[in-house]
């Protein structure tokens, strides 16, 4: 069997590493390649990307940027089902308000929103403080999720079909990434 060649960052980020370990069902050998490393191969097999979504759009005014997305719903759901087999048994809240533990300030009135949501039984959650398997459980068990747009919303993939979500985002940067994920679940 040919080994799998991956970017070394996959093995340095716990959630990426866990996803890779789960999906590497054949237990192929792994060769990691550094960011600026140049490698020559005799024969190289390349896998097509399941999804191709360009990250980190900033101040997009041209709607044509939306045409660069490729999203295979069927394969994404297959991957979701495999990954959910490894979700944590952690007891998690049904109503979650997503925040960031880092000191990076959100660009909306987060404290005022929290003031309203706590009256409705929401709990503040910083997804980056959970393991990948715990994040799957957190989102899969939630009935309501509210928060500012960010990477944590990729976990919408693991929500159950009845989950209700409010995602605050800038009106200047429209991207259908999270709504596309939510619609396939």
What are the residue ranges of the model-derived segments?
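The feature primarily captures lumenal catalytic ectodomains
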Residues: 1-185
């Amino acid at each position: 069997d040919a080994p799998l060649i991956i970017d070394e960052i996959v093995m340095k980020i716990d959630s990426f590493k866990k996803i890779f370990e789960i999906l590497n069902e054949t237990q192929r050998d792994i060769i990691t390649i550094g960011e600026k490393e140049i490698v020559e191969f005799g024969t190289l097999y390349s896998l097509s990307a399941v999804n191709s979504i360009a990250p980190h759009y900033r101040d997009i005014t041209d709607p044509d940027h939306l045409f660069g997305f490729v999203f295979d719903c069927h394969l994404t759901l297959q991957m979701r089902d495999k990954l959910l087999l490894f979700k944590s048994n952690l007891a998690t809240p049904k109503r979650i308000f997503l925040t960031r533990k880092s000191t990076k300030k959100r660009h909306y009135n987060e404290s005022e929103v929290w003031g309203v949501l706590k009256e409705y039984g929401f709990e503040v959650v910083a997804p980056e403080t959970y393991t990948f398997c715990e994040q799957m459980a957190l989102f899969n068990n939630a009935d309501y999720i509210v928060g500012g747009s960010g990477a944590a919303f990729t976990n919408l993939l693991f929500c159950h079909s009845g989950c209700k979500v409010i995602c605050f985002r800038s009106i200047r940067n429209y991207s259908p990434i999270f709504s596309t994920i939510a619609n396939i679940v």
